[in-house]
A protein has these predicted regions:
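Short, polar loop/linker segments at the starts of domains and inter-domain junctions
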Residues: 22-25, 43-47
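Short, His- and charge-rich active-site/binding loops that engage polyanionic ligands
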Residues: 28-29, 36-44
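Structural recognition of the beta-strand scaffold that forms the well-ordered cores
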Residues: 29-31, 97-100, 127
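Alpha-helical segment that forms one wall of the substrate-binding/catalytic cleft
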Residues: 44-86, 92-100, 104-112
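Short, surface-exposed linear patches
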Residues: 51-54, 91, 120-121, 142-143
């Protein structure tokens, strides 16, 4: 089930655009971060969306985009459940971050975060937060990555420990993220 908290989190960091635009990596995107280059709307999705919002309802672009985002999040959840057998055991906050990452960068790229996933599986929030920050994803999304690392850390002392480790081991990345830490 897709929580309201997850929807608000994704909306906050994706923002809404009712017209197609090029995202930060040059992909055509619309709505709340729907990459239409890699994931174009299928005719089935269009019909399904009209069923959800009503055939005779005037198109409200933001409402339509939110329904599309919810469908995409359901797809992410299905994929994560297939690839991460221990997903049901993580906290709601950790699941929120994994869902947000799966939505933002795609599940295949998320699965490449092996050290972060290993840390989550082993209940090591400091390492999980550090590994998220120690990534190209973090240098590209900055504020979103720092927010997700805070959530993974679980508390401010764990987050401080993760960021101190980043400053010591990866000062180049720390400097890029410092404004948001």
């Amino acid at each position: 089930m897709i929580s309201d908290k997850l929807i608000e989190h994704v909306k906050k960091y994706e923002g809404f655009k009712e017209y197609p635009y090029l995202d930060t990596v040059g992909k055509w995107t619309i709505g709340f971060g729907r990459n239409i280059d890699d994931n174009p709307l299928s005719s089935e999705e269009i019909v399904d969306l009209f069923k959800k919002v009503g055939w005779r309802t005037p198109l409200d672009a933001e409402h339509w985009a939110e329904k599309l985002m919810e469908k995409d999040l359901e797809d992410v959840e299905t994929s994560l459940n297939l690839h991460i057998p221990w997903l049901a055991l993580v906290s709601k906050n950790e699941a929120l971050v994994l869902m947000d990452l799966g939505f933002n960068i795609g599940v295949p790229r998320l699965l490449n975060f092996k050290n972060m996933l290993h840390a989550l599986d082993n209940d090591d929030p400091v390492t999980a937060a550090y590994e998220l920050l120690n990534s190209r994803y973090a240098t590209q999304t900055k504020r979103r990555a720092v927010a997700n690392a805070r959530i993974l850390a679980g508390n401010s002392s764990n987050f401080l420990e993760a960021t101190e480790k980043l400053r010591e081991l990866r000062p180049d990345i720390y400097l890029v993220l410092e404004k948001w830490i």
